[in-house]
Structure formats: structure tokens, C-alpha cells
């Protein structure tokens, strides 16, 4: 006689069968998500709640688990996107130990072929925010990591756009490194005769002399040592140009002081800047020939009156060379031993001294800005461009062409119509706002004489925060500047190049990303 199964065993078997049925139904729904949409809303909600209660009975734990799962999913997408963005051209240039200038001239016999079209377009999983037009996008450009396809193509073409500037003369301040250096190369490769000012003329000459096409334009380049903090020197330089040059078509007021560097930052260049002239290579000496030449007749008498007191003799003869002026200690921090903050032999991508200070000008509040720095910033960013634009206008009017340009290189820090304004670096904001006001006020006057004056924002090229903070932002916030120095250079010379190529000369505007923006 067979024993009857216990009632509890039968119940277990029935429950197991029901569980297997439930699993099969859930797997069917997982394979075809549209099935759940066919359920009445009440049953669908009960199903969601039942599954959730089984997975995590506690509502708080369930919410936390859901948030954690979403965060993990986002992290996975971001890791994928980081790989895509990491492969862009602008990221590759940033990883290079030393920035090299793009060679925009193809070799002889080269035939253009767009190999990029042969590649499958790269897509991001998370929608990106375009730096220029602010629209969302997912297709990633081969060079830019923060622009939509349309903006990226436009900006990429601008990097290599040239114009025929043969026979024209351009003045560029701050043309030794970074944006100024790239702008100088662009003007030279357009055929212009270029006058460059910098505090470190020998270092500047060596940099230009290292370009592969140096021989093509070296005879059209002259470099002058000039410290824009010293207003009498700026006046004297303008007087010298008036006496030695027959024409001037373009002025690019690029030099600026954003982050003040103490003398130790520049110390590594002093040996080269103060060495005997015969120790310099011949090509470097040629670029500096006009800078070292004696002043023209009447030059000294015309500039001596610039002294605070006319009884002071030898005004310019007693002034230190511009490079040595960088070693004058003006603030208490300039006297501190700083070898650990500016380690010898450690240079950045632009072959400039590494600055390891934990705090710099970019972090200062109003009550923290030294008076010396306040004055320096105004002198370099606003006063010097004012003097240059004013004193050299007669030189610009010596020739009849009405397609001349003045570019006052500005920044969004100087913009009043801006929704968000930080409380930091008010002195640089003031200086750029003053520069913009000069453009806004005087552009019409200069336009009447065929000179087109504009302010131009370079774009976001550099993270000005101290090195440690900037490095941490890359890791923690995935922050990378959206542009590089070639983009910045293309922006500041675009009023000239676009004007010459199109015949449409913009004037009296504040230009951002090649287009007018609010003041």
C-alpha cells in the first residue's frame, strides 16, 4: 500500500511550480518589453511593486539601490565616452610633452584626400553640450571633443585659413608664446611684415627660428623687447615705429597679464637674455637687429619729456632692458626663496617654467589683490593698448587703404552682460572691461579713417587655476578646455583674414567664436 504524500510536501510542489511559471512569465516579458504595456494599468503596477518588494523589501533600500544602479550605468557610459573623447585630435595635442605648431603647408606633389570620411562616425552614449552653439549632440568630431559636428567643421577650417597680406605691416604685442606666437606665425605665413613685442626678445627669436619654414619669412620678422608695464617705454616704442616705418596696416593688442608671476618664474631665461650678443646664433641676431639699433635722430629728445620730472636726465638710457625688468622685486612674495615652487629644468608644454604655487591671481578676491598687481594689470591690459592705438594712428593713416584693423584681445571676464560672474580676479575683469570700453567708444572714430577696431575673445584655452587644482579638475570633473592655442590665434586674427578674403570688414564689435556677442 503506497503512502500518501504529506499535505506540506504537496504545497511545496505547487509553490515551486508556480514560481517556475512566474520565472517563465518574467523572462518572456524581459525578452519582449511590449508585453507589459498590454497589461491593465492596475496589474502592471502590482507587477512592478511585487518584483520590487521581492528584490528589496525595504523601500528606502530599494530607492538607494535604484540610484546606485543608475549611477553605475552612467559611469559605464562615461567611461565609454571618455575613450571616444580621448581619441580626438585636440586631446592628443594636449598629451604631447611639447606643443608643436601644425604644419599647414602640404609637401610638394601632395593630393588632398579626406581619409576621415572612410571611418565610421564616433558616437557618445551620453549627449554632449556644444561649447559654441550650446546644442546637444552625440556625433564626435575627429579633432574637437566639445563641439557639435557643424561648429567643429567651421572651427577646424578656421585654424588653417589664410589671406594674402603681402606688402602689409602688422604689429603684434605679446608674440613670444602660446596664442600670440601662433597668431604671429599665421600673419607671417599670410605674407605680412610682422613687428613683434615681448619682454624676452631673444627667447622669442629662438622660438621663431625653430620653425621649419623660418627661411621663408624670417626677412619679414622683427622682434622688439618691450615691457608694457613701463608706460614711458611704450611711448618711446611708438615714437620709434613712427620714425622707422613707412606704414602700419594692422595692430593686434594681444599681450595681457592674467596671472602674475614672480621673478623666479622667468629666471631660467635670464642667462640667454643677458649673454653677449655674439653668443647668439646669426639668425637670432638678425631678428633683433632693429631692437638693438640706436634710436633715430630726435628720438631721445622726443621721449625724455615722458619722465615724471623733465629734470630727470637719460630717461630711456637708464631703463633696464625689458627682460631684466622681469627680475625687479615689487611684492613681498618676490623675495621669498621659491626653488621648490619653480623647480629648475621643469617646463610645461609651451616650454615655460612650471608654477607649483597653491594659489595664484586667478583665485584672489577684491581685498586680496595687491596694489602693485592691480596697477600692472591695468597698465598691460588697458593702458598700453590705449597708447599704442592712439600714438600709432598717424602711422596707419600714411597709406590710403581703408581695410586696416585693430584687434583688442579681450576675454569674457570683461563682459557686463553675463548671467554668471564669479567673485574672483576683479582686477583682470576691470582691465578687460576697460579695454572693451575703448573699442566701444573709439571704433566709430577709427572707422571713419578706414581702421576697423574690434574686441575679440580668445575662447577658453587654458585652465588658469593653480597646477594642482587644474590637475584635480581633470580627474574629478573630467574638465578639459574646449580649445587650444591655435584656435585662440585663429580667433584674434580672423577680423583681418576674413575681412581681406571677403571684403566684409567688421568693426565696433565684441567677437566671440567669430561672431558678435553682448558687451
Residue ranges with predicted function:
Residues 293-344, 472-519:
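C-terminal helical subdomain
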Residues 245, 441-451:
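Active-site-adjacent segment of SDR/Rossmann-fold oxidoreductases
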Residues 389, 427, 431:
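Active-site helix of classical SDR
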Residues 190-208, 222, 250-255, 260-288:
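Conserved glycine-rich Rossmann-like NAD(P)H-binding loop of the short-chain dehydrogenase/reductase
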Residues 156-201:
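Canonical Rossmann dinucleotide-binding motif of NAD(H)/NADP(H)-dependent dehydrogenases/reductases
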Residues 19-127:
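N-terminal alpha-helical interaction blocks
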Residues 121, 218-222, 240-253, 265, ...:
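A glycine-rich helix->loop->beta "capping" turn
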Amino acid at each position: 500500500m503506497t503512502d500518501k504524500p504529506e499535505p506540506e510536501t504537496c504545497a511545496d510542489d505547487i509553490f515551486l511550480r508556480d514560481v517556475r511559471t512566474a520565472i517563465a512569465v518574467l523572462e518572456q516579458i524581459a525578452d519582449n518589453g511590449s508585453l507589459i504595456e498590454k497589461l491593465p494599468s492596475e496589474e502592471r503596477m502590482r507587477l512592478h511593486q511585487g518584483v520590487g518588494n521581492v528584490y528589496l523589501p525595504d523601500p528606502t533600500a530599494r530607492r538607494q539601490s535604484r540610484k546606485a544602479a543608475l549611477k553605475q550605468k552612467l559611469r559605464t557610459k562615461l567611461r565609454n565616452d571618455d575613450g571616444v573623447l580621448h581619441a580626438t585630435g585636440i586631446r592628443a595635442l594636449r598629451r604631447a610633452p611639447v606643443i608643436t605648431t601644425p604644419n599647414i603647408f602640404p609637401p610638394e606633389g601632395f593630393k588632398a584626400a579626406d581619409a576621415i570620411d572612410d571611418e565610421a562616425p564616433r558616437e557618445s552614449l551620453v549627449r554632449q553640450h556644444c561649447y559654441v552653439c550650446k546644442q546637444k549632440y552625440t556625433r564626435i568630431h575627429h579633432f574637437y571633443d566639445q563641439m557639435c559636428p557643424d561648429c567643429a567643421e567651421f572651427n577646424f577650417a578656421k585654424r588653417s585659413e589664410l589671406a594674402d597680406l603681402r606688402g602689409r605691416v602688422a604689429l603684434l604685442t605679446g608674440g613670444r608664446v602660446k596664442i600670440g606666437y601662433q597668431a604671429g606665425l599665421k600673419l607671417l605665413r599670410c605674407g605680412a611684415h610682422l613687428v613683434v613685442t615681448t619682454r624676452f626678445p631673444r627667447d622669442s627669436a629662438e622660438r621663431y627660428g625653430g620653425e621649419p619654414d623660418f627661411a621663408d619669412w624670417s626677412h619679414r620678422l622683427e622682434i622688439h623687447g618691450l615691457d608694457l608695464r613701463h608706460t614711458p617705454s611704450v611711448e618711446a616704442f611708438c615714437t620709434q615705429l613712427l620714425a622707422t616705418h613707412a606704414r602700419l596696416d594692422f595692430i593686434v593688442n594681444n599681450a595681457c597679464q592674467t596671472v602674475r608671476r614672480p621673478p623666479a618664474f622667468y629666471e631660467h631665461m635670464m642667462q640667454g637674455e643677458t649673454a653677449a650678443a655674439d653668443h647668439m646664433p646669426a639668425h637670432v641676431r638678425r631678428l633683433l637687429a632693429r631692437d638693438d639699433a640706436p634710436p633715430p635722430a630726435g628720438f631721445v629728445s622726443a621721449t625724455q619729456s615722458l619722465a615724471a620730472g623733465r629734470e630727470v636726465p637719460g630717461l630711456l638710457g637708464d631703463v633696464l632692458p625689458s627682460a631684466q625688468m622681469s627680475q625687479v622685486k615689487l611684492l613681498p612674495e618676490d623675495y621669498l626663496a621659491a626653488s621648490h615652487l619653480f623647480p629648475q629644468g621643469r617646463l610645461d608644454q609651451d616650454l615655460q617654467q612650471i608654477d607649483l604655487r597653491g594659489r595664484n591671481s586667478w583665485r584672489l578676491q577684491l581685498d586680496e589683490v595687491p596694489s602693485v598687481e592691480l596697477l600692472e594689470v591695468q597698465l598691460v591690459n588697458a593702458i598700453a593698448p590705449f597708447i599704442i592705438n592712439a600714438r600709432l594712428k598717424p602711422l596707419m593713416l600714411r597709406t590710403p587703404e581703408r581695410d586696416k584693423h585693430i584687434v583688442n584681445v579681450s576675454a569674457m571676464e570683461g563682459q557686463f552682460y553675463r548671467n554668471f560672474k564669479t567673485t574672483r580676479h576683479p582686477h583682470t575683469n576691470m582691465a578687460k572691461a576697460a579695454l572693451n570700453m575703448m573699442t566701444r567708444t573709439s571704433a566709430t572714430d577709427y572707422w571713419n579713417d578706414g581702421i576697423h577696431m574690434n574686441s575679440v575673445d580668445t575662447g577658453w584655452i587654458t585652465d588658469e587655476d593653480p597646477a594642482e587644482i587644474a590637475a584635480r579638475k581633470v580627474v574629478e570633473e573630467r574638465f578639459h578646455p574646449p580649445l587650444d592655442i591655435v584656435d585662440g590665434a585663429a580667433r584674434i586674427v580672423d577680423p583681418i583674414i576674413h575681412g581681406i578674403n571677403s571684403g566684409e570688414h567688421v568693426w565696433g564689435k565684441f567677437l566671440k567664436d567669430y561672431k558678435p556677442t553682448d558687451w
